Amino acid sequence: MEGWQRAFVLHARPWSETSLIIDLFSEESGRVRVVAKGARRKRSNLKGALQPFTPLLVRWSGRGDVKNLTSAEAVSLALPLSGITLYSGLYVNELVARVLEPETRFSELFFDYLHCIQALAGASGSPEPALRRFELALLGHLGYGVDFLHCAGTGDEVDDAMTYRYREEKGFIASLVIDNTSFTGRQLKALATREFPDVDTLRAAKRFTRMALKPYLGGKPLKSRELFRQFVPKKRPLPPEGETA
């Protein structure tokens, strides 16, 4: 690779006694796996920079599936995530690492990711709106095109008070049946604008994104969810799956 790229660390794991294998999300090359030689040494200049949620400038070399990281510099301090927002950020990182094909450019998604992490870092309330917006953006970049504003059966604009059932590869069709695939016109309009003014629209957004992301994630559970279970006190109720890690 020639030149520098903006990037974030999605995941890192030890490799040999002194090095790391790192999944990066870069602006121009998408998800890239690199080996950071010597990054685990106490005096390594890379050790402090290669942390999740730290904006980086990176360079690498090589043509195989795993590149050699040659340079990495922190552009700024890590975005401050803690508690529920930290687990939300880990969920976002795992989602990107799981669903993106390696070395495929997703420049617009890179900025959607950045905006999501910034929103989580600045969140004073629930992280859910930021998570739902990112999930919808991710689905759009994956080619999951859905018309939320028109009935797939008639072409008419959705009505706030009517119910529509989702049909894969078709869209939303007016229906009297209410089940887990049903949404009101009001909820669909919220999905289209990615604005969720209340609990009802947030829950509908979570329900839709869980359903839409399932084929990309397969049956393998998200590790970030298990981390949440492990570190959050048991007396505190767990958020529904997909809200955070």
From Swiss-Prot:
Domain of life: Bacteria
Single GO BP term: double-strand break repair
UniProt keywords, alphabetically: DNA damage, DNA recombination, DNA repair
Pfam families in the cross-refs: RecO_C (PF02565), RecO_N (PF11967)
Annotated Gene Ontology cellular component terms: bacterial nucleoid
HAMAP family, alphabetized: RecO
Role description: Involved in DNA repair and RecF pathway recombination.
Protein family (similarity comment): Belongs to the RecO family.
Name of the protein in question: DNA repair protein RecO
